[in-house]
Design a protein with these regions (language model features):
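A general secondary-structure signal for short beta-strands and their flanking turns/coil
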Residues: 13-15, 89-93, 128-130, 143, ...
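Mixed-charge, glycine-accented linear interaction segment located at domain edges/termini
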Residues: 146-204
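Oligomerization/assembly interface segments of phage tail-like spikes and tubes
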Residues: 83-106, 166-181
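Beta-strand-rich interaction surfaces with strong enrichment in secreted/lumenal proteins
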Residues: 82-84, 137, 160-163
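Short helix-loop boundary/capping segments
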Residues: 102-151
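Polar/acidic, low-complexity leader/linker segments enriched in S/T/G and N/D
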Residues: 1-56
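A glycine-rich, hydrophobic loop/mini-helix early in the fold
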Residues: 43-93
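Short acidic, glycine/tyrosine-flanked loop/strand segments centered on an H-E-D-like triad
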Residues: 64-72, 98-103, 146-159
Length: 204
């Protein structure tokens, strides 16, 4: 089948609004369930497959993806120069910032535990929480939606709360993106780590 390359106006979006949903590790989103996701949805799905909205995220610091490694090396043979290109191992992360300073955020990002009476306590030694993440964004001008699914992510806080007098207090976390056992392999037989849902996937 030919690649679906061409001019597709519905694929052009701005990330005006967005939300991050979390579920147990290796949870996959079916095509039927995908259509239920909106940025305002508190939960999507039921039981072990339920996705929970992490709430208000920063509008100043949107989720930021980063790759480390992946440098190219060109190898030659005695017979031919520049015979083959190989790439170093690549690792991916996403950093996101909540502005919702409730106990749920601290229990999710900081592994906090309830104290007697009031408050939560957390260690400065990071312990990752293994979850599936779905980062959803929406263009309010077109009502188009798109999203990235990270089924196998290790989440931990990346900083202590960032205070501000002219913006919301932010609570930052970073997820290390790992290979998934539930996503399909790519056409080269490699394990995959990320799934992308295009605007057309939300309407079909």
């Amino acid at each position: 089948m030919a690649d679906e390359i061409g001019i597709h106006d519905d694929g052009v979006l701005t990330a005006v609004r967005g939300a991050i949903f979390m579920a147990k590790a290796e949870t996959i989103i079916t095509s039927a369930l995908l259509k239920q996701f909106t940025v305002e949805a508190a939960t999507v799905g039921v039981g072990d497959d339920m996705w929970t909205n992490l709430g208000h995220m920063s509008n100043d610091n949107l989720p930021e993806f980063a790759l480390d490694g992946g440098d190219a090396t060109t190898l030659s043979t005695w017979l031919k120069a520049a015979f083959r290109t190989q790439y170093a191992q690549t690792t991916g992360t996403v950093t996101f910032n909540s502005v919702q300073g409730d106990k749920g955020t601290f229990k999710t990002f900081y592994n906090a535990v309830d104290m007697t009476g009031a408050g939560v306590a957390f260690s400065l030694e990071k312990t990752p929480v293994n979850k599936s993440l779905f980062i959803l964004w929406s263009d309010t001008n077109t009502t188009g939606r798109a999203g990235l699914l990270l089924p196998n992510s290790d989440i931990a806080f990346s900083s202590l709360p960032a205070l501000s007098t002219d913006s919301f207090v932010e609570f930052s976390a970073q997820a290390n993106i790992k290979t998934s056992s539930t996503l399909p392999h790519d056409k080269n037989g490699k394990f995959t780590s990320v799934a992308y849902f295009a605007p057309s996937d939300f309407t079909v």
